[in-house]
Amino acid sequence: MHRRGVGAGAIAKKKLAEAKYKERGSVLAEDQIAQMSKQLDTFKTHLEEFASKHKQEIRKSSQFRVQFQEMCATIGVDPLASGKGFWSEMLGVGDFYYELGVQIIEVCLALKHRNGGLITLDELHHRVLKGRGKFAQDVSQDDLVRAIKKLKAMGNGFGMIPVGGTYLVQSVPAELNMDHTVVLQLAEKKGYVTVSEIRESLKWEKERACHVLDHLLKEGLAWLDSQAAGEPQYWLPALFSELLSQDVTPEEANQMTP
């Protein structure tokens, strides 16, 4: 027996059904989008009411500020996106992060002679708090990170390098590639590193290790202790814990190193 072919009428009927399903699907999608948009508008309204009611806590408490910014992020609102507008005018967060950015720049410039433009996030936090005084708004490390990201977007050399669960803040436009970063991470525990340690830990050739260390010396990010026992040590002042609370020159630091 021969199977009967599908007739033109059946094909047309099938296409009509598919078109209706597609149209119905489009209507459902539009309804869902409209509902989601309405829910977002409602959430944004509640968020604005919450911000208005708790603006003093948001300004004063760093923990409260982090939680509020996480709430904003869920609907794509960035209170830091502009220095003007509803959020900045209501909360003053634009001015807060602008002033914090200025403080960060001042601290980094004051210590550049000592650390070459690299500073741990912990030390930066300590010095910013010290400079603000005990009656100023509280500042968290999260606030610092947000302010640094704003500075980085301005293209003035600021950036962050992950080291041992925290960050090194870079405040100079020095070219640091992945090789430089892994050497900084290697030096994190002791504050210094040697060519032999780099070769043993990273399995590099001597020329590669020396090239990276020479670059760090040239940029002022490392100091050389050529009198160290065994072989020269390359100290990273940003990681050198004995110097964290002291403003000393490289000459003074050489007298302190073993």
Swiss-Prot record:
- Coiled-coil spans are 28-50
A GO biological process of this protein is: optic chiasma development
Where is the protein situated, by its record's location annotation?
Answer: Cytoplasm
Q: Which UniProt keywords apply?
A: Coiled coil, Cytoplasm, Protein transport, Transport
Q: Which Pfam families match?
A: EAP30
* Gene Ontology cellular-component terms listed: ESCRT II complex
The record's function comment reads:
Component of the endosomal sorting complex required for transport II (ESCRT-II), which is required for multivesicular body (MVB) formation and sorting of endosomal cargo proteins into MVBs, and plays a role in autophagy. The MVB pathway mediates delivery of transmembrane proteins into the lumen of the lysosome for degradation. The ESCRT-II complex is probably involved in the recruitment of the ESCRT-III complex.
- Assembly notes: Component of the endosomal sorting required for transport complex II (ESCRT-II), composed of SNF8, VPS25 and VPS36.
Q: Tell me its family.
A: Belongs to the SNF8 family.
> Which protein are we looking at?
Vacuolar-sorting protein SNF8
This chain's source organism reads Danio rerio
